[in-house]
């Protein structure tokens, strides 16, 4: 009787679609994409997970991170691997939150591996440099990641062209300066971006808005161009909300959905809600999407 009492009632016939239950993601721009309502498929080869997520507190920082395979990749048969990646960490002295976000290029057959190696290498090198008291060096950081990506390509018996990725690394002070601000160190290559929540929208801290017919064509990426890495130190105000994102999120923060995300991420949401936000459904937005959002003093 005890076992029977814990059984869920059998749903009526026809209650669940033949292809499985639909997964409804929020639609910040109204119309959704047809692919978002299609079943998720598997790649032919064993794959990294289609969804990765973390919810952590590091000192006075609250962090939500999520990476999802995009509708255009997950509904194909066979599906494509999630080509985005992120990593979180902290320095040995626990003074900095370290984060890296990487976006594998769709026309590189092993870019999912390249993105994961890049994100891991960037955080590891940042941690090592800060641990020995050195200032972060963007070009050296990205050169180290490029070498590891090249080594992985050789191990996989593929070319460096098969593992290309864009990337961004950040070091965020756990505690604020006496005036409440935080000097955030950022280093990036290509269109992975950093954003600061400002009122009902977002201000871009790294990268440039996409324009023209070739707006999605990258001319710089790892492992080929670590010397083109750009670096900035940005002072963020008390209570700031900082977002690090691949273009699957960055493109909508630059567009009409920016107020929706600003409202949703005014404070740290439950991780399940955050994953749903990152997995948003919008017509024409089919790419993988990744966001690491940091709330200061929350």
Model-predicted segments: where are they?
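N-terminal entry segment of metal-dependent catalytic domains or homologous docking segments
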Residues: 11-124, 192
């Amino acid at each position: 009787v005890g076992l029977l009492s814990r059984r869920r009632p059998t749903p009526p016939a026809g209650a669940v679609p033949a292809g499985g239950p639909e997964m409804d993601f929020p639609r910040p721009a109204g119309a959704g994409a047809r692919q978002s309502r299609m079943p998720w498929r598997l790649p032919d080869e064993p794959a990294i997970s289609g969804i990765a997520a973390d919810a952590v507190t590091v000192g006075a920082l609250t962090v939500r991170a999520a990476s999802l395979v995009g509708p255009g990749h997950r509904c194909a048969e066979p599906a494509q691997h999630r080509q985005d990646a992120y990593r979180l960490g902290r320095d040995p002295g626990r003074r900095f939150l370290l984060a890296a976000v990487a976006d594998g290029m769709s026309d590189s057959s092993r870019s999912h591996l390249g993105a994961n190696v890049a994100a891991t290498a960037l955080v590891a090198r940042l941690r090592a440099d800060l641990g020995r008291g050195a200032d972060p060096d963007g070009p050296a950081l990205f050169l180290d990641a490029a070498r590891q990506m090249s080594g992985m390509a050789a191990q996989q018996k593929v070319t460096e062209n098969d593992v290309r990725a864009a990337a961004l690394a950040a070091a965020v002070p756990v505690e604020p300066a006496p005036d409440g601000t935080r000097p955030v160190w950022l280093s990036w290559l290509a269109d992975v971006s950093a954003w600061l929540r400002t009122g009902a929208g977002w201000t871009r801290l790294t990268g440039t808005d996409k324009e023209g017919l070739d707006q999605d064509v990258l001319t710089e990426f790892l492992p080929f161009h670590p010397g083109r890495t750009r670096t900035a130190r940005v002072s963020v105000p008390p209570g700031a909300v900082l977002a690090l994102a691949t273009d699957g999120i960055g493109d909508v923060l630059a567009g009409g959905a920016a107020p929706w995300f600003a409202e949703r991420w005014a404070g740290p949401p439950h991780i399940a809600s955050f994953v749903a936000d990152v997995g948003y459904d919008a017509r024409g937005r089919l790419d993988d999407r990744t966001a690491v959002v940091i709330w200061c003093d929350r």
